[in-house]
Amino acid sequence: MSQRLRTTRLALARDFASQSRLRLLSDGERLPWGRRETFESDPARDFGGLQQQQPAFVLCPADIEQAQAALRFLYDAAIPFSLRGAAHSPAGEVLSDGGAVLDLRGLSSLLPTASPDAVRVQGGCHWLSLCLPLAPRGRAPRVLTDNPHTTVAGTLSVGGFGDSSHRFGLQVDCVRAATLLLPTGQRCEVTSDDPLLRYALAGRGQLGILAEVSLPLWRRGWALHARVLHFADVTSFVAASIHLAETQRVDCLRARAHAVPPHAVSAVVGTYGAELDPALLRDLPYAAISEPEWLDFLAHAQQAGPPGWAPYNPALEVVLPLPSGLGLLSELDALAHALGPERLPRGYSLQVLRGRGASLLPLVPLPDSPWALIVALRPECQTLDEAQQVQARLQALLPRVAAVGACVYLASFPVPASLVEAQLGPERATLGELKRRVDPKGLCNRGALFGYVLA
């Protein structure tokens, strides 16, 4: 990107920002959100840390009208732009080299609804900020990720899975309606049967900004009565998880694989607001079980604050078909053991949920099998050289991902076009058609689809 073009774009943006009273950042200024000296406030970095791209400028709209004005300006000026929330992305999806970054965390309001069992929330709101006012009312989102310090629109743009996905599927499956801002600035009110919303959910920002969404709420308290089940191997964990998912009587199922003998997987299993019935766990193939205790993940998240990550975090998160993907899981597990606890201090996440047939959405990153297993490897590295070496080892597994019919959920590196096309399947044509309709100049979130550019 030439310095002359950067300078021209910045001059145009300063004029626009001055006239519209919209906050503009440039020349390495930090974002007004997040912890200092971390990727959270650095517009040139994201969670992955393996890429650094300096935008010509950043626009920080404070409401939907400002976001629309920013989009119209960017589109009229033909300036490519990336949409940024909490930047919990590993491959530079929220970065821009010489273009613009649109930071959406100013769109963070909770809006009134007629029903106590629904919520309307703006896309830049953190999940934690959504949950805190719901808790005293005995309400919760149906699915919540294990890191609530991410934005609503950010997780909905990729899918979003959590410890109740065995009951309700992905977070995108819960969206009932939305306000979508198209890349041109046009505002669209869409419902769950509208193709624009159906392809915006898990669409990685290709169709614009999820400015507001309507979500059904779960009537439950936040006190979780739980036990920790330890499994000698992943096969036993998968069998137990499928049984618990089929019974639909356990509210929470949160698991991590680790390298602490003699247990391969440990899973928190529990129910909200009532004691966990021991009969629900009878005959499950666990190797050991803890005494029951009461937990409050919301209070813990509020007290602990955002996770402390290493400077560099290469990542590969895949969704495996069951049982055919268990061979690849063995390879992923072998790599995790080789990387060791210094790079995977928390182990890695596992989640069993139903496959693609359980979702009505076209872009959900789920295989066609009845059951699927999400495996999330996010090694922590202290140097860029170390991270690049680890990333190369993760990247080497992509041919196996394709061979078993698995889906990539997140990756810190570009995914081969053939694998992206296979994952999108026939839905690629419809997504491409919608993209050309709402973003004819191809300015919004270029490359955010695993590095793939829709033709």
What would you call each of these model-derived segments?
Residues M1-R23:
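Intrinsically disordered, low-structural-confidence terminal and linker regions
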Residues L5, L12-A13, S96-G98, D283-A455:
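Conserved glycine-rich FAD pyrophosphate-binding loop
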Residues A17, L74, L83, L134, ...:
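A generic structural signal for well-ordered alpha-helical segments
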Residues L22-L31, T38-D146, G159:
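Glycine-rich N-terminal segment of FAD-binding domains in flavoprotein oxidoreductases
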Residues L59-C60, P90-L111, S164-T184, I209-P216, ...:
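Structural signature of FAD isoalloxazine-binding scaffolds in flavoprotein oxidoreductases
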Residues Q66-I79, L132-D146, Q186-L201, Q391-Q395, ...:
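Short, hydrophobic/aliphatic alpha-helical segments
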Residues S157, R176-G327, A334:
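C-terminal substrate-binding/cap subdomain adjacent to the FAD-binding core in PCMH-type
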